[in-house]
């Protein structure tokens, strides 16, 4: 079995059967388990302090360095197809003509044609045929060849060192590719054994973008969603309907949803941004509801039927009935969940040792109306997760408020931003917790000190449950579990009440304390990364292991005695008995003294300044020590696997506490941002009001270094539904629009907001149309993109929506554009009565305020000082009459002659 604690790591320590013969204390490999246990009782081992894991004897480092067989390709490398052999694809060869190893490779490749197959050969993962060509080009590796049989000759081969496989696989996963790992399931035979026997190998892991568990392959601060979709196209009066299931196998979260409307599916997929999407698609063309950049994996030739899905769900969650899952009214979502579980079964199958697929929690059904709706355009315009210009984290809303200290807290805060709340009671409860943490600075700081060193318990528990956790993962789990009582004491002693979901921190499962204590009792505090070389388990844990260690101590004593004896026999006080990983134990003497060694010494190696020898006794004892050490390492691995299995059984309880800790971390982050930024707690109302006093942009305010941000008021929904905002170019109108949208969103995640005071009603959707670009690939001009976005708003906005418009109609003739802008404004203020701020350079729209009582005019002020224009960035009542476009052009660096000519043309047009 390949070690599950280190995906690309060591082979399982091979146990050695004791040889026959007389049993003596100095030949412990011949002792049975009972005698070793008795030895441990007679000579009990005392628990030692943490020691560095090192080689078992005095060592001299290897002078040789192995070169990697697959190195970055040089400039003279030519990977053109003309140089490839005719069998550059595995399907072109006859398996019977291949060597046994390559025949096995082709069989596995035929079962995984869509994945890159990495086949373990010694210290390398190799691939052949088309995968070798693909891998060499993707990773810039040397493309070489391997003899495949007399009738075939050489076939393409490329490979990567097994110790660097995680780095290379990470790059492949990042590119959206899937990888099948074929590892050795048994140790290589000892030297001198019969050659030509094919080692047992099989697929041990399938790595896909949506199913990876390894820390190095995941982004710590965001969920890694695997999504499955089942759709029913519109037929007659039946609308388009879809079911969605998404799971993060690294954290165990499992969500399902069912709804009408393909646009809603597109929005949900854009919000989740899954790493991988699986669905049934009978066409080669991607469906319109699927964002183009998502990695798709078509499943099967037939959609999953409801009976198949029900059977898979019952088996997965070990249920007799699905009534408790609440999926009866969402049949498409149930089928999607079944497809997702079937895909996990293919990529994470049960192995011979009972290693289970990643543990998932029971699915939670999400309903329309649970969260504020944000379409993809609004997410981009408000720059929630990344900036619009260069897609960078710095400069986004999440960057501005993320003070989280744990990876799970960062993911939680991101989820809050991506799905703001709609339930006023939940919003107020979360806001009350933030308020308490703001007012209690010592408590907030104490909580943050405890949270800072905490590991990612959510994902650590998942790896333990899937049998992939290493020893250091388990130690990190113990560290986190030990902090639960400290967090609980702080909260109960200083926080009045607290949210109900904090109960998993205040009253954790009692079994978690037992788990933490068991890890501390058994595992070293700083265990090695490798699970196959010992150094994992404390003394005093297992009598059999203690007995083996006693015998190893005896052998170390024998080696020390032997060194003294050989010094005396050779009359050489500088002689050293040393150990080398490759050459084993040897006697080292200087070249000058090498001619006067005893006759029974056997020369083993000659170096520049020393000679290395062995003796028959030393060689015999070396074999015994190696066998004994292998038995001890095997026993440590068995004990570790037992412990990991016990922890995996409690993965769900660990995750519950981890989710509570994540929420606590997110709350302290919001409190820290509010306390340090001078924010206020908004009043959440049941009406449509949005009254903001001295509001500020939460991101721009932090980015300003020299100048102070100019705060502004906003008033919507209290008699005014539409504000027509006019003012010069580059005066800050777009910033003001985004500021309003971000304050609305912050209020609905339960956060404080950057303002002096605020009263905010719940919005069902936020729409933005800020700036426009063409979409040439889709055959749409800038104006058509603008009109499509406007149409989407007019079709879906309601009186509880917040609409933020920055210029409509500017991409066509002036009067056409003005007419469109006027009609859109009337529709928003009249038919929809949606809360709207419309920034425009069509000053004619100021007349709407005289026609409709729910329309008001505002302007961004500027100050003219001679020929200069000073932007005040202050919003005031009333409409502007000029846009100062020529002055803005001058400030942007347009040549003076062009600016002067523009003024002349403007004067001519004005007359």
Swiss-Prot record:
SUPFAM superfamilies: DNA repair protein MutS, domain I, DNA repair protein MutS, domain II, DNA repair protein MutS, domain III, P-loop containing nucleoside triphosphate hydrolases
Pfam name, any one: MutS_III
One GO cellular component term: cytosol
One of the record's GO molecular function terms: mismatched DNA binding
CDD domains per UniProt: ABC_MutS1
Annotated stretches, region: Disordered: 1-95
Record family assignment: Belongs to the DNA mismatch repair MutS family.
Function: This protein is involved in the repair of mismatches in DNA. It is possible that it carries out the mismatch recognition step. This protein has a weak ATPase activity.
Name of this protein: DNA mismatch repair protein MutS
Biological source species: Synechococcus sp. (strain CC9311)
Gene label: mutS
């Amino acid at each position: 079995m390949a070690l599950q604690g280190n995906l690309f790591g060591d082979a399982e320590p091979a146990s050695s059967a004791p040889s026959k013969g007389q049993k003596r204390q100095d030949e412990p490999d011949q002792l049975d388990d009972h005698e070793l246990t008795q030895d441990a009782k007679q000579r009990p081992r005392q628990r030692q302090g943490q020691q560095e894991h090192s080689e078992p004897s005095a060592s001299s480092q290897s002078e040789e360095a192995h070169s990697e067989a697959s190195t970055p390709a040089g400039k003279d490398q030519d990977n053109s197809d003309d140089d490839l052999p005719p069998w550059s694809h595995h399907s072109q060869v006859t398996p019977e003509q291949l060597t046994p190893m390559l025949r096995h490779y082709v069989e596995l490749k035929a079962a995984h044609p869509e994945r890159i197959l990495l086949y373990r050969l010694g210290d390398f993962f190799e691939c052949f045929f088309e995968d070798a060509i693909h891998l060499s080009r993707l990773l810039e590796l040397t493309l070489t060849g391997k003899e495949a049989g007399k009738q075939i000759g050489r076939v393409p081969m490329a490979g990567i060192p097994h110790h660097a496989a995680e780095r290379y696989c990470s790059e492949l996963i990042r590119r959206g590719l899937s990888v099948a790992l074929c590892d050795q399931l048994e140790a290589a035979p000892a030297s001198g054994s019969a050659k030509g026997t094919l080692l047992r190998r099989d697929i041990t892991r399938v790595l896909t973008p949506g199913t990876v568990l390894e820390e190095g392959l995941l982004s710590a601060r965001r969920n890694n969603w695997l999504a499955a979709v089942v759709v029913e196209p519109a037929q007659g009066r039946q609308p388009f309907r879809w079911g969605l299931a998404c799971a993060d196998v690294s954290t165990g979260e499992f969500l399902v949803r069912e709804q009408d409307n393909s646009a809603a599916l597109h929005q949900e997929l854009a919000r989740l941004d899954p790493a991988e999407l699986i669905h049934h698609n009978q066409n080669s063309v991607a469906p319109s509801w699927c964002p183009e950049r998502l990695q798709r994996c078509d499943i099967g030739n037939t959609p999953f039927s409801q009976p198949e899905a029900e059977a898979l769900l019952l088996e997965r969650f070990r249920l007799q009935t699905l009534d408790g899952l609440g999926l009866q009214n969402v049949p498409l979502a149930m089928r999607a969940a079944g497809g997702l579980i079937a895909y996990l079964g293919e990529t994470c199958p049960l192995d011979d040792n009972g290693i289970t697929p990643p543990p998932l929690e029971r699915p939670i059904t999400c309903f329309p109306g649970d969260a504020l709706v944000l379409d993809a355009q609004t997410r981009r315009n408000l720059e929630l997760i990344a900036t619009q210009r260069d897609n960078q984290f710095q400069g986004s809303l999440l960057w501005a408020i993320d003070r989280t200290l744990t990876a799970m807290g960062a993911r939680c805060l991101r989820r809050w931003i991506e799905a703001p709340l709609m339930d006023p009671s939940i919003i107020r409860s979360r806001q009350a917790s933030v308020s308490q943490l703001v007012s209690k600075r010592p408590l907030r700081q104490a909580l943050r000190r405890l949270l800072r060193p905490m590991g990612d318990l959510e994902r650590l528990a998942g790896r333990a449950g899937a049998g992939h956790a290493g020893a250091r993962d388990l130690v990190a789990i113990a560290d986190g579990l030990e902090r639960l009582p400290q967090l609980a004491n702080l909260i109960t002693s200083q926080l009045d009440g607290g949210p109900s979901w904090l109960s998993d921190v205040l009253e954790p499962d009692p079994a978690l304390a037992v788990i933490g204590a068991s890890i501390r009792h058994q595992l070293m505090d700083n265990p090695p990364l490798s699970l196959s070389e010992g150094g994992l388990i404390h003394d005093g844990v297992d009598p059999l292991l203690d007995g083996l260690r006693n015998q190893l101590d005896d052998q170390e004593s024998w080696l020390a005695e032997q060194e003294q004896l050989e010094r005396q026999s050779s009359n050489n006080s500088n002689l050293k008995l040393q150990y080398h990983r490759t050459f084993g134990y040897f006697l080292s003497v200087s070249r000058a003294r090498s001619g006067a060694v005893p006759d029974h010494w056997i020369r083993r190696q000659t170096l520049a300044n020393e000679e290395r020898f062995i003796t028959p006794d030393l060689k015999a004892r070396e074999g015994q020590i190696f066998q004994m050490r292998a038995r001890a390492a095997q026993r440590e691995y068995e004990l570790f696997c037992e412990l990991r299995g016990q922890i995996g059984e409690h993965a769900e309880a660990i995750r519950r506490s981890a989710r509570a800790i994540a929420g606590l971390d997110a709350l302290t982050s919001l409190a820290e941002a509010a306390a340090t930024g001078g924010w206020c707690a908004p009043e959440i109302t049941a009406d449509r009001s949005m009254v903001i006093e001295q509001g500020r942009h939460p991101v721009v305010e932090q980015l300003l270094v020299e100048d102070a941000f100019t705060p502004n008021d906003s008033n919507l929904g209290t008699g005014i539904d539409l504000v027509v905002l006019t003012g010069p170019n580059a005066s800050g109108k777009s910033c003001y629009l985004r500021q309003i949208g971000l304050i609305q969103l912050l209020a609905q995640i339960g956060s404080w907001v950057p303002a002096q005071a605020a009263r905010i009603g719940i919005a069902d959707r936020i729409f933005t149309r800020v700036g426009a670009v063409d979409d040439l690939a889709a055959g749409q001009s800038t104006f058509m993109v603008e009109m499509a976005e406007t149409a989407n708003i007019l079709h879906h906005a309601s009186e509880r929506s917040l609409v933020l418009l920055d210029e409509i109609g500017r991409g066509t003739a002036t009067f056409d554009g003005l007419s469109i802008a006027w009609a859109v404004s009337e529709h928003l203020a009249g038919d929809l009565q949606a809360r709207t701020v419309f920034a425009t350079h069509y000053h004619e729209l100021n007349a709407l305020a005289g026609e409709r009582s729910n329309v008001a005019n505002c302007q961004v002020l500027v100050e003219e000082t001679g020929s200069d224009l000073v932007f005040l960035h202050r919003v005031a009542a009333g409409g502007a009459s000029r846009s100062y476009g020529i002055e803005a052009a001058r400030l942007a660096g347009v040549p003076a002659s062009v600016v002067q000519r523009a003024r002349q043309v403007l004067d001519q047009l004005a007359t």
